[in-house]
Amino acid sequence: MKKIINKRPLKPKYWILCEGETEECYFSIVKELKLLWVQIQIKKIGQLPWNNKKRIMWEKKKIDYSDKELKETASKVFFILDADVYSQQEIDEQRRLLETNNIHLLYSNKNFELRILLHLEQYTKEGDNYIREIKKHKPNYEKWKSSSTRVILKDIIQHNLKDAISNAKKLEEKHKNLNSILAKNPYTWVYKIFYKEKIN
């Protein structure tokens, strides 16, 4: 009689596609510290010129081909986007395109440094002076200085992740009646990756 082997259920996996090095570093630290209940894979694909939309679809096809577990787990693919270099029309088009291909768009307005700043304070001012504000808490922080930035960023994430989630939720509540992404300033949707609930 053959021995029955009970397969352990596969752990869900998130693929995180991002534009820049700061985002890539951030989520590599999240992975290292095991702050998500799922496996995560991070890939930096650079800023996407939206006159060449096939690029991200190609990345998605490569993921589907290389990661067969995606079809067997409750896994998701996310694209982390800075909103400050796009028009509202481009953002709306991006969102439709990505969601049609089962990619969840998580944007920050104006950019990802807002996400980092929210670990340190509740910030509600319009503009994009996030690095200046971060440096009030962490004077040696720079936008991207390799290992030195990583050490500071790891400390911020390790000790202040709950604050970042709470502060981002407050911004969402503040802007709940606005439909335009660019009108929501400042705003970030990235915190939703830390929730098990459906991402809309």
PLM regions with names:
Residues 2-11, 24-46, 62-78, 83-200:
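C-terminal accessory helical subdomains adjacent to catalytic cores in phosphodiester-
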Residues 13-17:
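Conserved beta-strand elements of the Class I
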Residues 49-60:
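N-terminal carbohydrate-binding/catalytic regions of secreted carbohydrate-active enzymes
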